[in-house]
Amino acid sequence: MRQQNCSQHQSEVLGNAGTETENPAMGRTNATAFDISSFGGEKAIVVPAYPDLCFPEVVFPTRRVALVAGVEKIRELVVEHHRLLWHSPLQPIFGNDEKHFWKAVELTADFHAEACGGPKLYTQKRGHPHLRVRHFPFTIRERDRELWLDLYVEALRKVAFPLEVAEEYWQWIEALSIRMINRRSTVAPPVRIPFRTIAHQLRQ
């Protein structure tokens, strides 16, 4: 399927060709001047549309991850990661009810185990995960995501997650984590963290 950028799509919807324009109050801009008849033939300044945050494709793990690592190792990883989160600057995101927190961790472990090819425990209990929607009540910024991933590296190392499937698991959570950002704090795109940049830490 052909993909369009936002500016191209808007131009096609309006059915007008855009040109660079100059406005006495704004100077020369990268905005586009559209001849819109409903404005009496006057040219209007239109700032081009652009994507604020582009989500990369998310490749889920194959069932090889569950076969090699084992469901219990995946669950151990999720629990260790959340133990680190609970004792990190991200703890306020989860509230003060530690009992509720660990109950939610069990559901998260179900989801990760199922996503990696394990039993469908999560969908049997909760149905579709709707991850982005479920995270909307919490403020998650770019730097929160980066710390979340840093702690994942530490958790992978601490539980000795099998290196032969660590990259497959990492590429899933690294890309997926971008979709959890719901409060922009910079115009720069989220930092990508390829597996090759963290692999050496897992061998320590």
Task: Describe the function of each predicted region.
Residues 2-204:
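Core of compact, soluble alpha-helical bundle domains
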